[in-house]
Amino acid sequence: MCIRDSIYAASDGPSLTRELEYALSLGAPARLVKPEGLPFPVREALCFERQAQLSPLPFLAALLPELTVYEHSPVRDIRGHRVRCDGGTVTAEQIVVATHFPMLERFGLYDLRLRQERSYLLALTGAPPLPGMWLDAGEEGWSLRRSGRYLLLGGGGHRCGENLGDSYDRLRAQAQRLFPAAQEAFAWSSQDCMTLDGVPYIGPYSSSAPFLHVATGFGKWGMTGSMVAATLLTARLTGENYPYADIFSPQRFFPSASISAFWEGAGYAVRGIGRRLFVPAQTAAADIARGHGGIVAWQGKKYGVYRHTDGTLFAVDIRCPHRGCELTWNDDEKSWDCPCHGSRFDYTGHRLSEPAKAALKPCKDFPQEI
C-alpha cells in the first residue's frame, strides 16, 4: 500500500465547485487544483489528499494465514441455516453472501435491482510518471494510476451485453493520444454490479431472512466498498451499532434515485425476451467470418454461432439459462453476454460469470463447416 493524492479531473463540462462543496461538508480533505505539466489537458481538478492506493493481492495474502479457505466447494443452495456445497452441507447461525451477484433468487429481487457493467484496462510501459491517482470526470470515465513500472489506463465501460466490438480499440486509441511513446504490456477487462441509486447493498439479504447478509453492488469501487462491507457486517454480526447502516441497507428505497433505473432494468429484461421470441435472426452462418460470431436461424430455432480461426463452427442455444433473455455476441472477448442481468458464456457455452448457474446447451447437430 502507498499514500497518494486521488484526483478527479475535468477537461471540459461543468465546474467541480459543487463537488468540492459537498466533499468539504463531509469533512473530506479536498481542494480544487489546476495541474500543469501533464500529457493531457485539465481545466481543473478536485484533489483528495493522502489517499491509500491498495494492491489487493498482497492484502489478501496477508489475510490468508488467519482464514480457512475451502477451494473447489461451490455453494449450490442455502436453505435456512444450511449451506449446501458439492462436498457436503455446512450449518451456520449467520451467513454472508458475498458472491459478486447475489446467488439466492428467492429473496430480495436482486436481479431487478442490479445491472452489470464491463470496463477495460491496459497496462502500459514507457509512459511518463504521473503523480497520484486520476479519474476523468467525463462520460468515458478514464482512470490512470501507477502500479510498479506500469501505468494502468482504464475506461470504456458499458452495460454487459452492449459491446460494440471496439472497446479495446478505443482504449488503445486513448493511450496513443495521451502517451504516444508507451507500449502495451497487458490488456484485460472486469465486470461490476451496479445498484439502482449508485450506493452498494450491504446488510440484511431480505427482511424475511434476518440470518442472511449480503454485500454487493460496489459499482467499480470494489476495494473501497469491500472495506465498508467488512466494517458494517462485522458490526452487524457482533451486535454493535454502525452509524451509516441505513444508507447501505438493501431494504432502502429512494424513489427519486431508484424508480427510473428500476424501470430501465425491467425494460432490458422485456426487450431481451421479446427479441428472442419475435425478432428473426439476421445473419447466415456462411457470412460469419473467422474469429467472429452471430445469431443464426437453423431448423426453426435461433442459435449463437461462432466461427473459430480454423474455420470450425460452434453453435449454442442463444437463450440465457437465467431468465431466458437473448444473448448478444461480444466480439472483443469472444463471448456470449446477457444484456438483461449480465451472465456471460464462452463460445462453447461454458459459463463465465453469474447470475446464470448453468452452461449454454450446445447444438451438436449444427454443421461444423458451412
Language-model segments: which ranges?
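Rieske [2Fe-2S] iron-sulfur-binding domain
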Residues: 122, 292-369
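Rossmann-like flavin
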Residues: 4-62
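A conserved short coil-to-beta-strand element within the FAD-binding core of flavoproteins
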Residues: 33-38, 71-84
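Flavin-dependent oxidoreductases
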Residues: 78-146, 272, 276, 280-286
